[in-house]
Amino acid sequence: MSIITDVYAREVLDSRGNPTLEVEVYTESGAFGRGMVPSGASTGEHEAVELRDGDKSRYGGLGTQKAVDNVNNIIAEAIIGYDVRDQQAIDRAMIALDGTPNKGKLGANAILGVSIAVARAAADYLEIPLYSYLGGFNTKVLPTPMMNIINGGSHSDAPIAFQEFMILPVGAPTFKEALRYGAEIFHALKKILKSRGLETAVGDEGGFAPRFEGTEDGVETILAAIEAAGYVPGKDVFIGFDCASSEFYDKERKVYDYTKFEGEGAAVRTSAEQIDYLEELVNKYPIITIEDGMDENDWDGWKALTERLGKKVQLVGDDFFVTNTDYLARGIQEGAANSILIKVNQIGTLTETFEAIEMAKEAGYTAVVSHRSGETEDSTIADIAVATNAGQIKTGSLSRTDRIAKYNQLLRIEDQLGEVAEYRGLKSFYNLKK
């Protein structure tokens, strides 16, 4: 009764109005699962391949009909007849069917859509929540949210090199309260921006994208919003950055060229100077996490940054690790970073995603489950965060339904878990000496 009888994919739109995949999986019993695939704007060069059509006459070349056809004509034929509960076998079968190291033949977007839909169908068959199916009986930790309330870099037109300025409500007693802290700070920030005559339009991830005078102006404004909402920076709420440094790293000159986003007169820094600058910010402000502070291929820079700040601040590898156990294993071996960002579409299956999270935990690295800038209403990452007890989630600001969908799912999960639910706040940063 749990045997897969049909697999069907269609082209739908993501939060940026670009095509993506939606996949449905059906079983003999009538159990059903649906998965939708996100898409990134700033992507690591080592990520699994997102298959696009390249036909400029249709969606500007971004169509996903090839990936849809690969699901309907190739993957479906291969996995119909499998037990929907055998996630690993199905994921491994798709990886083997693709046969490339980066899923470039069938497309990681095609494979991931099926992987998510299979898990959801299995949970539906067993009549249990997705987080329970994925994580078993020990699922209880609600993640500390990293809320991206200021968008810069490739996520907005704001003249700031850093891609994300985040708040982390670590002092809240529950996830529900953490969400309230964040929402109140978000609205306080909007009032401050309006009072300064700055833009309050939002970027791809729901954060504001005002024309600040620079990074420190952005941080100071966020601190003012935290206080205006009645909270204490460095106690109730900390700050985090996603530098997305690969987006402004000049490979030829081997420098971090802030002029790409901030214009003429902005800084151009060597690796050593980039580390000095990040340390200066950490010493000045209540910063607890920095993502992609160095370029994805600047291994020496990453090791030096970790040596300098790795005991004080969470140093998250996103483009650096691309949710890949090979890169993560090297990072662990060489002492580079102390945390990994987990994006399901960077690697392409739930099985490989869970392997990366497990490897990180075993090495004492934290794992931050993350959205992409091009999202959908699919809330699977909320269930993954709880299923793995990851302790942290990054899923955007306090606006845009594609972001709020994940927060609302976490509220439901917290309610369902009842007294068992744990919100660890600062304790989620077990890689730091605090």
From Swiss-Prot:
Consequence of substituting D250A: Plasminogen-binding peptide inhibits plasminogen binding less well
Annotated metabolic or biological route of this protein: Carbohydrate degradation; glycolysis; pyruvate from D-glyceraldehyde 3-phosphate: step 4/5
A biological-process GO annotation: glycolytic process
Gene3D superfamilies documented for this protein: Enolase-like C-terminal domain, Enolase-like, N-terminal domain
SMART domains xrefs: Enolase_C, Enolase_N
Chemical reaction(s) catalysed: (2R)-2-phosphoglycerate = phosphoenolpyruvate + H2O
EC number, UniProt record: 4.2.1.11
S-S bonds: none
Uppermost EC category: lyase
Annotated positions binding (2R)-2-phosphoglycerate: Q163, K343, R372, S373, K394
Summary of the knockout phenotype: Essential, it cannot be deleted.
A molecular function (GO) term: magnesium ion binding
Active site (UniProt): E205, K343
Cofactor: Mg(2+)
Keywords, in A-Z order: Cell adhesion, Cell wall, Cytoplasm, Glycolysis, Lyase, Magnesium, Metal-binding, Secreted, Virulence
Cofactor detail note: Binds a second Mg(2+) ion via substrate during catalysis.
Gene Ontology terms: cellular component: capsule; cell surface; extracellular region; peptidoglycan-based cell wall; phosphopyruvate hydratase complex
Region feature Antigenic epitope, mapped onto this chain: 55-63
InterPro entries (alphabetical): Enolase, Enolase-like_C_sf, Enolase-like_N, Enolase_C, Enolase_CS, Enolase_N
Localisation per UniProt entry: Cytoplasm; Secreted; Cell surface; Secreted, Capsule
Functional note: Catalyzes the reversible conversion of 2-phosphoglycerate (2-PG) into phosphoenolpyruvate (PEP). It is essential for the degradation of carbohydrates via glycolysis.
Subunit structure and binding partners: Homooctamer formed by a tetramer of dimers. Forms a ring-shaped structure.
Annotated HAMAP family: Enolase
Classification via PANTHER family: ENOLASE
Family under the similarity heading: Belongs to the enolase family.
Name of the featured protein: Enolase
Taxonomy of the source species: Bacteria, Bacillati, Bacillota, Bacilli, Lactobacillales
